[in-house]
Amino acid sequence: MNPVPMPASNALSKPLLPEVEAANAWHDAELAAALVAVLRHKAGGIRVCAQPGPVRDYWLALLDSFTETPARRVPSNTPTERLLGGMDITESMRYGKPVLAQGVLAECHQRVVALSMAERLPKEFTGHWCAALDTGEVHIARDGISHTSPASITVIALDEGIDEESPPAGLIERLGLSIALDEISIRCVDDSRYARSDILSAQSRLSHTTVPDDDLTRLAELAASMGIHSSRTLKFTVDIAKALSLLSGKPVSDE
């Protein structure tokens, strides 16, 4: 049974992959959704390169079915005062002291956030998203208010960019996963290989799953040989390998 309704067609701007390749690409995208659901903020999130259409909608609905909480859509042009929060004028006047109006990032604590048109995220707002991904918090210090709120978020960066358009590099490097959907036909989208119970089972065992020291060393050496020296990237790789192991039933070293 399909986890979500399947649309009838898909409008794509890129040539479609051959059927077998497209089916494999969809299975990879499906696995990526399961990994995001298992890891949440541990993976930062995922970059989804795709134009609006039924395949992207189906993938987002699939992720919602894995998390059982719909992703909250946040436009990329959401300003600082709405992202971080600020003084609630009405309540401040009522109580005669500064009262905080919670921002979007704090409202989305422990939730999945779909950042619409991430390729157009203004530079002046990028730092707020990156800080929340780095620390799991947002800090506000203005209008007589100094407050830190939890903001552990999982970001789905919806990248609709064409040609040279791309989300800010600082955001991309904080997302552990990336998929592209535009070359997948809706006809190649099939039933999910994973269920909500698989996600919950993997989550419950994740903290008890370890990567052997030898494998960690090999991963670090491989990353260095490829010119990758980011500890964040290495951590993403380790966490993703553990989640893959739990979803596939294979040893971590195989992943």
What is each stretch, according to the model?
Residues 146-226:
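Phosphate-sensing "switch" segment of ASCE/P-loop ATPases
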Residues 77, 209-213, 235:
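Alpha-helix N-cap/helix-start motif at coil-to-helix transitions, marked by capping-box chemistry
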Residues 2-182:
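Conserved ASCE/P-loop NTPase catalytic core
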Residues 222-255:
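C-terminal helical "lid" subdomain and adjoining coupling/linker elements of P-loop NTPases
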Residues 56, 80, 196-199, 216, ...:
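Alpha-helix initiation and N-capping motif
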Residues 124, 170, 214, 232, ...:
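Short, well-structured alpha-helical interface segments that form or flank functional binding sites
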Residues 53, 57, 217, 235-239:
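An alpha-helix initiation/capping motif
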